[in-house]
């Protein structure tokens, strides 16, 4: 769940899924509170898996309806919550690349002259992936 730090060929990466990081992603954070609350975890253990899967799907869809499309669209570089998270991390430590995927949007945002935030997008809608040679680039297939 927590982003992991990697040194690859002298470049420092912070890599993670990206869920729940930064000031946005309210729908995910709301859903996570429910699913990690001890009473609901206890209750969930007593449900038949078929019912548990249906409930999980129901709350996931309901969460998306509550959040609307705000969580699914690009908010601009100044409002993109994972970019804001990356900028905050840069105040603590230098990273060359931040790589996440939670937003499912292909994004490549230069944070400063030596740090870049890359959101990998997805292979279903955008056909995007990341490639690291001497630098990290977002590519399409």
For each predicted feature, which ranges?
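Conserved catalytic scaffold of divalent metal-dependent phosphoesterases
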Residues: 1-92
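Active-site environment of divalent metal-dependent phosphoester hydrolases
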Residues: 21-23, 97-110, 126-127
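Active-site neighborhood of phospho(di)ester-bond hydrolases with catalytic His/Asp-centered motifs
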Residues: 1, 15-16, 97-102, 118-121
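Binuclear metal-dependent phosphoesterase catalytic core
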Residues: 6-9, 106, 110-141
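Structural motif
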Residues: 11-13, 97, 140
């Amino acid at each position: 769940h927590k982003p992991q730090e990697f040194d690859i060929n002298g470049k420092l990466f912070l890599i993670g899924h990206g869920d729940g990081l930064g000031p946005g992603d309210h729908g995910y954070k709301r859903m996570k509170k429910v699913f990690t609350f001890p009473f609901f975890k206890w209750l969930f253990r007593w449900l038949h898996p078929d019912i548990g899967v249906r409930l999980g799907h129901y709350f996931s869809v309901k969460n998306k309806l509550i959040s609307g499309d705000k969580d699914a669209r690009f908010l601009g570089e100044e409002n993109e919550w994972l970019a804001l998270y990356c900028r905050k991390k840069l105040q603590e430590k230098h990273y060359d690349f931040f790589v996440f995927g939670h937003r499912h949007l292909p994004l490549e945002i230069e944070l400063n002259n030596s740090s870049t935030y890359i959101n990998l997008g997805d292979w279903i809608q955008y056909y995007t992936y990341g490639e690291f040679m001497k630098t990290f680039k977002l590519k399409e297939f």
